[in-house]
Every structure is written in C-alpha cells, then in structure tokens.
Amino acid sequence: MKYTELKDKSIKELEELLHAKKAELFELRVKLKNMQLSNPNEIKKARRNIARINTAINAYYSSSVE
C-alpha cells in the first residue's frame, strides 16, 4: 500500500483501514508467538502500513486546521 493511494481516501475510510490493519498486526503477532507464522517479515510490512495510514490521517487533520 502506497501513500499516494491513501491520500485520496476519506478520513472515515482511513480510520476503518487503520482499525483493520491493527487487527491484522495483532493476528500476526499471535501467530508468531504460536510458531505458525511462516514469514516474520509480514509483521514489518504491517507496521509500515499502519505508519503510512497514520501519516495520511495526520496530514488530513493538519490541512483541515489551516
């Protein structure tokens, strides 16, 4: 997921996507602890996606304040 894809979405869509990605990260961490995760790099990708979504949300709020 790229930032350019995220900046065109509404704030409601971004918050829903953020909630879904956090749930996905939780599931990945549970799988990692249970030794069921075949690719631990997925956790890194999920964290980066969450950071991108948070950046888009913060950009939306900072642009609406001005």
Curated annotation (Swiss-Prot):
Keyword DNA damage: no
Record's keyword terms, sorted: Ribonucleoprotein, Ribosomal protein
First and last residue of the signal peptide: none
A cellular-component GO term for this protein: cytosolic large ribosomal subunit
Name assigned to this protein: Large ribosomal subunit protein uL29
HAMAP family: Ribosomal_uL29
NCBIfam families (alphabetical): L29
Gene3D superfamilies: 1.10.287.310
Domain of life from the UniProt record: Bacteria
